[in-house]
From Swiss-Prot:
Residues 76-79 are annotated as: Involved in Mg(2+) ion dislocation from EF-Tu. NCBIfam families: tsf. The keyword NAD does not apply. This is Elongation factor Ts. It comes from Nocardia farcinica (strain IFM 10152). Associates with the EF-Tu.GDP complex and induces the exchange of GDP to GTP. It remains bound to the aminoacyl-tRNA.EF-Tu.GTP complex up to the GTP hydrolysis stage on the ribosome. One of its GO terms (cellular component) is cytoplasm. Belongs to the EF-Ts family. GO terms for molecular function: translation elongation factor activity.
Amino acid sequence: MANYTAADVKRLRELTGSGMMDCKNALAETDGDFDKAVELLRIKGAKDVGKRAERTTAEGLVAAKDGVMIEINSETDFVAKNDEFQALANQIVTAAAAAKTADLDSLKALDLGDGRTADAALQELAAKIGEKLELRRVVSLDGPVATYLHKRASDLPPAVGVLVEYQGAGDAAAEAARAAAMQVAALKAKYVTRDEVPADIVENERRIAEQTAREEGKPEAALPKITEGRVNGFFKDVVLLEQPSVTDNKKTVKQQLDEAGVTVTRFARFEVGQA
């Protein structure tokens, strides 16, 4: 006969965050001694960290504050919904924003002000909930920065985040910069201007466009014009300023920004589980 009650299991779950079967097994193994069961689960959690290190993390969230953005990964979206996970993410990004943290090693070693580093706090939570959790990346931009965070579902935290660093003043400029951030989130631009696109990438696109036109049987005399048109199409896909605006497809992003007196200097886009 079990020497513990359902109330004991519930209390142990609430205290440790462990699964129901883990709590039942711990109480059974310790002959119903609650304190020993807590200790046993904590030891088990520490041992499981090594096993979790081999597992993949494709879920999680993106958080941003004051020009700093971080991505923290979990194994499942169930954990991404977890209040403690989200609260810790907010604590980490707040500390990162205050310190203007710009690289992953510094983020992991970041002092959270409660005696823990960001990485130690995350691994402590990982041991409690039984999933691999990891700090994946961080970026810090300067000057005025517009932020946009996008949720894939209403019950999930943001999975896509964009920071846009810009030059401009006033509410209209801030609104235009945020619209540009939404644009980057939706259409995944990689560069601000075509001058930023590496020459070898442009040349490769040009070569592919010309070869494709030849294989389609296009007239030799028309190849240069067709090739140039397709390369320009490539630029519209990857260059922010040349994309049609998602809020007004009769204008390019550049036209909208010019009207608001805004110059985008750089941007960063994070998407959970993506490069």
